């Protein structure tokens, strides 16, 4: 089993790209990420068709299913079952501890009521928050979110082929902004989001957000 401490500042000063699973990924190619340091949230990179450098997930099943040759970071206890990791822990899996493994829900706020546990990563309402924190932990100077859309494009709310999931866009929209604010304060990073179109008119595609 790898340790989170071993990953600290492994990519100091770099730009790190953090993938959510939103529909804007449908307008990107896997080749776009070939020369980039990437952190995938759950199955996002796998669904798009490339192998990221790191994966963060709240779910043991998805951490197990990811191929070798990349670091997988997950909670010591699975978010759904609340059970500890069963069996041997592979060398490419990092288990992080939390004081409480119950899902934090709508009240989550890293700035006030839910500061991330020291020497661990944020446990937010979305696995994306842990991915964002992992990028900062790795030493990123700049974090670029990809597919953190909090809405639909042409009626689609996920990248094509991704397992159907919840649509808590109002909640996630609020919490993503709180996570950004915390990272800027604690790490001095910049946090931006990729628009795969030429401008915010989306080349005629229709976005519906919160």
Model-identified regions with their sequence ranges:
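Metal-ion/cofactor- or nucleotide/acyl-coenzyme-handling active-site neighborhoods
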Residues: 1-210
